[in-house]
């Protein structure tokens, strides 16, 4: 999978999780974005079940922002086909989130959660290149 480190960092900073970003590798930034989205999806599901409409709308909005951050972080120059497929998947997820928000549809949230978990598992299986570099090399990442 291909992502731009700068875009991922700005997207993650925009959701208020600055503490872990400072020293994180680009690989870790994407993991943090995905973890943040999954945490908020679980929160939104509970808010729908408790009829917390205002909170649910805000939480789903944050998930949409995170997924947009993942989408704009894609590096289309590295693998055009994969990045286009991921962009289409992120667009689909956001459309499902909008439907979930409008209709209080827990099944749409569950679908997005499942898709994002699958992506995160694939991403987590990719070794972080900074683990294999010497200290002098990590500064260039």
Short names for language-model regions:
Residues 1-43, 47-50, 55-61, 68, ...:
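N-terminal intrinsically disordered, cationic/polar leader segments
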């Amino acid at each position: 999978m291909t992502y731009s480190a700068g875009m991922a960092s700005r997207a993650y900073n925009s959701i208020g999780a600055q503490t872990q970003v400072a020293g994180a590798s680009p690989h870790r930034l994407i993991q943090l974005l995905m973890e943040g989205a999954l945490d908020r999806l679980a929160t939104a599901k509970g808010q729908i079940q408790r009829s917390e409409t205002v909170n649910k709308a805000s939480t789903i909005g944050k998930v949409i922002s995170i997924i947009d951050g993942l989408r704009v972080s894609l590096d289309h120059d590295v693998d055009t086909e994969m990045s286009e497929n991921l962009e289409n998947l992120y667009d689909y997820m956001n459309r499902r989130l909008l439907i979930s928000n409008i209709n209080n549809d827990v099944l749409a949230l569950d679908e997005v959660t499942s898709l994002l978990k699958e992506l995160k598992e694939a991403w987590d299986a990719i070794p972080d290149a900074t683990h294999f570099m010497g200290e002098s090399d990590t500064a260039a990442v």
